[in-house]
Regions:
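Charge-rich, well-structured scaffold segments of protease-associated domains
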Residues: 2-76, 90, 96, 107, ...
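Short loop/turn motifs at secondary-structure junctions and domain boundaries
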Residues: 84-87
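Residue-level marker for the onset of beta-strands and adjacent loop->beta junctions
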Residues: 90-91, 114
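Active/ligand-binding-proximal structured segments within catalytic/core domains
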Residues: 100, 107-158, 232, 357-370, ...
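Basic, alpha-helical interaction scaffolds
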Residues: 377-378
Length: 512
């Protein structure tokens, strides 16, 4: 009797367990079907690093289907990218006048402001040793009054328009530009034409401006980065016009005369040496450029009437460059000063000209190397290596293009006892591009590279950048870096900086 009772209880408990199991299974199925929005939380005994791994996996899944609003131009899903901004960007219109002067405009009538400027292919490269500094001196004197406008009248006219008039000089170009309201564009063009064709160059004001330029030279001399790059050009392009400084030596500034300035204008400020931003680096001409609230036809007619006294000198800058080419010389210059707190140096290779087909690839390489500053936080590729090891204060990859050559390399600032490690890290990152290029690094550099220095349609620019693949990077790196001469400029406590032969060997041998 007792055994029969126990068997009955056993069968009843099994039926209850089966019913409970079926109910739980049904509830689980319903829950799975209705609640798929959030994954179940991890069990309590799961380790912290396991939870982090699950989070990483979740992020990777989201990256496989990114938001199309944030896709880059070279996205793996280009069909989802929005190219409306490229299609609506204002067209660059170019007109060449009978005297050779070129007029370029980008019209955006919805804008209330405009920028008009004159770009001239004239800089320190086209001076002589005796006149070095006259191009920059001319930039200062161009605002010191004309036959019909005194200095005060010129300043008041610009200020009354609420405008901004400025200029700058480089090794190959000089630019004068004005930022004004759209309705004041004719006045701005009149001012630019007046100062470029009718400047008085009063001897009294010339003598006064000498002191201003000499003080400017002292200020530039205190900017160590400017000093490094001036010395880098001087040693890399020694005994060539491109090695001259923009400001010129102090002895030249003290003896430049009105005649020197006028001769420079008549020789280099000719109409056929004015060029649009579209072809600014492909030819040796001069430019009238306007953008914003402007109409192309109106600007062309105004330029025709105003710019009538430009020089007709037939000499082109192409002829000048061919006569005195910038030849790269492997060399170094070191200015040791142990009293300075930090050492800085630049290592440069002979780079590409603006017209070189590999110039875009070098720009991508520059973006791959990146830049970094300790005070600005994290940086890009090589900068992160220097940051992790805390061996540099800052670094910057640079790529400077000229008409027939260029300079490509890295500039760095570091403590004296870290120079050896910094130099090795820099040369390792540069040289390994000849052997190994990561697709991720290449894609990142392409996405960061959005400027070229001259007006190119965005679609063409993106196509040029996207055409650079890993094989192109290695080919260009072997052309410009592998076993090539270098130029070095260094200043500060540079006793521990490796010698020239150490750097030169690491263009072909990656060994500490």
């Amino acid at each position: 009797m007792a055994i029969r009772h126990l068997l009955k209880l056993s069968r009843r408990s099994q039926q209850t367990l089966a019913t409970t199991t079926r109910s739980a299974s049904t509830a689980t199925a319903v829950s799975t079907a209705s609640d798929t929005r959030a994954p179940a939380p991890p069990p309590p005994n799961q380790m912290i690093y396991d939870r982090l791994a699950e989070q990483v996996k979740s992020k990777l899944k989201r990256l496989e289907h990114p938001d199309p609003r944030f896709l880059k131009h070279n996205s793996p899903i280009p069909a989802a990218a929005d190219h409306t901004s490229l299609l609506t960007y204002p067209e660059t219109r170019i007109t060449t006048l009978p005297n050779g002067l070129r007029v370029a405009t980008e019209s955006n009538l919805a804008s209330k402001t405009a920028t008009v400027g004159v770009w001239i292919d004239a800089g320190s490269r086209f001076e002589t040793d005796e006149t070095n500094g006259v191009a920059h001196f001319l930039e200062h004197m161009i605002f010191k009054g004309t036959a019909k406008r005194s200095v005060r009248h010129l300043e008041e006219e610009i200020e009354n328009m609420g405008g901004h008039l400025n200029a700058y000089t480089s090794r190959e170009q000089t630019t004068y530009y004005a930022k004004v309201m759209g309705e004041d564009v004719p006045k701005a063009l009149d001012i630019l034409s007046d100062i470029l064709q009718n400047s008085a160059f009063d001897d009294r004001l010339i003598n006064r401006e000498r002191g201003v330029i000499l003080r400017e030279m002292e200020e530039v001399g205190a900017q160590t980065e400017e000093v490094i790059f001036d010395h880098l050009h001087a040693t890399a392009f020694q005994h060539t016009p491109l090695g001259r400084t923009i400001l010129g030596p102090a002895e030249n500034i003290e003896k430049i005369t009105k005649k020197d300035i006028q001769e420079y204008i008549s020789t280099h400020y000719s109409a056929h040496r004015m060029l649009t931003a579209e072809f600014l680096y492909d030819y040796m001409l001069q430019v009238i450029s306007a953008s914003g609230a402007v109409k192309h036809e109106d600007v062309v007619e105004q330029v025709k009437k105003m710019f009538t006294k430009l020089s007709a000198n037939p000499i082109t800058t192409s002829q000048l460059v061919e006569k005195e080419p910038a030849l790269f010389t492997g060399s170094e210059v070191r200015m040791r000063d142990d009293d300075m707190p930090l050492a800085q140096f630049a290592v440069a290779f002979n780079g590409a000209s603006w017209t070189d087909p590999d110039s875009v690839a070098l720009m991508v390489i520059q973006a791959m190397l990146g830049s970094w500053n300790q005070s600005a936080g994290g940086g890009k590729h090589m900068g992160s290596i220097l940051a992790i090891n805390e061996i540099a204060e800052s670094m910057m990859a640079f790529n400077t293009n000229y008409k027939d050559t260029g300079l490509f390399g890295v500039y760095a600032v570091a403590k004296a006892d870290c120079l050896d490690d910094v130099a090795f890290a820099i040369m390792q990152e540069i040289s390994k591009l000849c052997y190994r290029v990561g697709d991720d690094d290449l894609l990142r550099a392409q996405n960061q590279l959005i400027t070229y220095g001259r007006r190119i349609p965005f679609a063409e620019l993106f196509a040029r950048i996207d055409a650079v693949d890993a094989a192109t990077i290695k080919r260009v790196a072997n052309r410009f870096i592998f076993d090539q001469d270098i130029a070095i400029a260094a200043s500060g406590p540079v006793k521990l900086l490796p010698d020239y032969n150490w750097f030169r060997r690491r263009t072909y041998m990656l060994r500490y």
